[in-house]
Amino acid sequence: MQIGIDLGATKIESVLLDDKGIELHRNRKESPKNYKETIISITDTVNNIEKKFKKGLNVGVCHPGSTNLDTGEIQNSYNSPWLNDMKFSVDISKSLNRKVLCENDANCFALSESFDGSAQHYKIVFGIILGSGCGGGLIIDKKILVGPNAFAGEWGHIPIGSSNSKNNIEQYISGKGLERLYFSKFKKKLVAKEIFKKAREKSTNDMEFIK
C-alpha cells in the first residue's frame, strides 16, 4: 500500500492505494495558510491513515511550484506563497521520519496519465491542470522533462502580448485569476467555486462573465 497526497492552495487531498492501484481510502480537507501548519496537517493526515491501515507506508506528495535544483527549496509557488524558499521535501520527510518523494503537481498528473491513464500509448504527453493556478507537465518516454530551471511545461506563465508583458495565461483562466477578474468587474469578492455555482444557477451576470 502507498499514500498519495495532493497539496493545493485550497485543499489537501489524500488517497491510499493497494499494490494493484485500487483505492482503499480518500480524504479531503482545507489547506492551512502557513508553512508550519501545512507540515503538521500533512503529517496528521498520514498518521490518521496509518492508524486505520498499516504503519510505515510509502508516501508521495505533489505540490504547487517547483523545486530549485541547486538549493532544494520550493520556488514559483504563486498561489501558496508560504511554500516558497522552504525545503519542503526535507521538512516533510523529517516530520514523517521517512523519505517522502515530492514533485510538482502538474508533473505528477501528466506522469500518471502517461503510465496508466488516457495517454499511456503516447511517447510525448503534455498534461494541464486548471485549479487555483494553471500548471503544466511535459513527459517524454515516461520521464518528466524538468528543464534547467525546473520550469518546463509551465504554460500558465507564458507572457501574453509583448515579451516584457507581466500578464500571463494564469491571470485569466485559473481559479485565482477568475476571482481577481470578477472582483475587478463587480467589486465583489467570491471564490471561483461560488462564481461557477451562480453561473449554473442561471445568474445572468455570472453566466456572461464565465463566457
Regions found by a protein language model. Name each.
Residues 27-57, 167, 171, 177-211:
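Adenine-nucleotide phosphate-binding core of ATP-dependent small-molecule kinases
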Residues 18, 63, 140-141:
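A cytosolic small-molecule/anion-sensing beta-strand core signal
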Residues 64-67, 131-133:
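Short glycine-rich anion-binding loops that position phosphate/pyrophosphate groups of nucleotides
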Residues 32, 36-43, 47, 55-59, ...:
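Glycine-rich phosphate-binding loop and adjoining helix at the ATP-binding site
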Residues 2-40, 73-75, 144-163:
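Short glycine-rich, Thr/Ser-proximal phosphate-binding strand/loop in the N-terminal lobe
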Residues 120-172:
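Glycine-rich phosphate-binding loop of actin/hexokinase-like ATP-binding domains
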